Swiss-Prot record:
It is found in: Nucleus. Keywords: Developmental protein, DNA-binding, Homeobox, Nucleus, Transcription, Transcription regulation. Belongs to the Abd-B homeobox family. The lineage of its organism: Eukaryota, Metazoa, Chordata, Craniata, Vertebrata. One of its GO terms (cellular component) is nucleus. Residues 224-283 bind DNA. This is Homeobox protein Hox-A13. GO terms for biological process: regulation of transcription by RNA polymerase II. It holds the Pfam family HoxA13_N. Binds DNA as a homodimer. It comes from Gallus gallus.
């Protein structure tokens, strides 16, 4: 596991007092071989690597890309199958990704496979601020596994130095039930919180002119009434003349009236039906008044 800090004294204090929840972290804390890594260019001075007090390089000397220390047998045994827990340190809240510009002090044994598994050192310094932050460390808490509040999903957004324009999001998103997810999913993915929501009323409008949505049932449709077009005086005169001749219209008569008045046969039929109903209402009204 890699830490960064500006002070060597704070690094030693953090590593001596670190109690992790996995076998690898416990072995790394007890072993004198420290896996330390310096800040990248935006976080510290250029080419500033973390060393113990006895191994600090002389000023002006070129620093190697990887500096090896004595073999760490305890870390070799537990690094292959150890899982990385949440760590809590008292001096910052940093991601576990570093660039290749600075030196890395690691063990020469296969314990470095643990760092290769969880670290990506092939990216440039410019890509550091845009890469996904897969691990985070919280400050001001005691050692132990992270216990989130039930009913909430904790999604911290790791701040990056040099990227002040990056928006910060709320760390607590309400959910119906807490669902832990794997740490390999990354922290940059958008989190969707499913919640039961009442369906809003259906406001979709059909492009068809004769189809409208029913207000009581959003999924059912009924044929709407077309706009009423009043008959002209010439049409009404012809219809009234034919009605006076015969209240019930025949097929041949309907076709002839349709051609004369420039109306459809359906319109002619409906007009005769309405005219008979109207006459019936007038007769019934006269009977009731008399």
């Amino acid at each position: 596991m890699f830490l960064y800090d500006n002070s060597l004294d704070e690094i030693n204090k953090n590593m001596d007092g670190f109690h992790a929840g996995s076998n690898f972290a416990a072995a790394a804390a007890a072993n004198p071989c420290r896996n330390l890594m310096a800040h990248p260019a935006p976080l510290a001075a250029p080419s500033a690597a973390a060393y113990t007090s006895s191994e600090a390089p002389a000023a002006g000397m070129a620093e190697p890309a990887v500096k090896q220390c004595s073999p760490c047998s305890a870390a070799v045994q537990s690094s292959s199958g150890a899982a990385l827990p949440y760590g809590y340190f008292g001096s910052g809240y940093y991601p576990c990704r570093m660039t290749h510009h600075n030196a890395i002090k690691s063990c020469a044994q296969p314990a470095s496979t643990f760092a290769d598994k969880y670290m990506d050192t092939s990216v440039s310094g410019e890509e550091f601020t845009s890469r996904a932050k897969e691990f985070a460390f919280y400050q001001g808490y005691a050692a132990g596994p992270y216990q989130p509040v039930p009913g909430y999903l904790d999604v911290p957004v790791v701040p990056t130095i040099g990227g002040p324009g990056e928006p910060r999001h709320d760390s607590l998103l309400p959910m119906d039930s807490y669902q832990p997810w794997a740490i390999t999913n990354g922290w940059n993915g958008q989190v969707y919180c499913p919640k039961e929501q009442s369906q809003p009323p259906h406001l979709w409008k059909s492009t068809l002119p004769d189809v409208v949505s029913h207000p009581s049932d959003a999924n059912s449709y009924r044929r709407g009434r077309k706009k009423r077009v009043p008959y002209t005086k010439v049409q009404l005169k012809e219809l009234e003349r034919e009605y006076a001749t015969n209240k019930f219209i025949t097929k041949d008569k309907r076709r002839r009236i349709s051609a004369t008045t420039n109306l459809s046969e359906r319109q002619v039929t409906i007009w005769f039906q309405n005219r008979r109903v109207k006459e019936k209402k007038v007769i019934n009204k006269l009977k009731t008044t008399s």
